[in-house]
Swiss-Prot record:
Name of the gene encoding the protein in the UniProt record: tatA
Name of the molecule in the record: Sec-independent protein translocase protein TatA
Keywords: Cell inner membrane, Cell membrane, Membrane, Protein transport, Translocation, Transmembrane, Transmembrane helix, Transport
Subunit structure: Forms a complex with TatC.
Gene Ontology terms for molecular function: protein transmembrane transporter activity
GO CC terms in record: TAT protein transport complex
Sequence similarity: Belongs to the TatA/E family.
Compartment list: Cell inner membrane
Amino acid sequence: MNIFGIGLPEMIVILVVALLIFGPKKLPEIGRSLGQAINSFKAGARDFENEFKREAKHLEEGVKVSTSASEPEKVVDVSSATNTNKN
């Protein structure tokens, strides 16, 4: 078992130290608060990503509309036709 680069023996040591520091009554409360904070952070990151994708799609659609609305102008090079008769 390897979570965040921490193996099982390290996790046990961390839990024992946390149990000694906070006590058995506060440990579940702290775990619950930590879990809620992590879930809130994930939800915020997901919302940010969705908003970013939505704006990128909106910008792409705007660029497609503006490029399809204006047709490129045709340019004719007249100088090559007049230079062939100078020999």
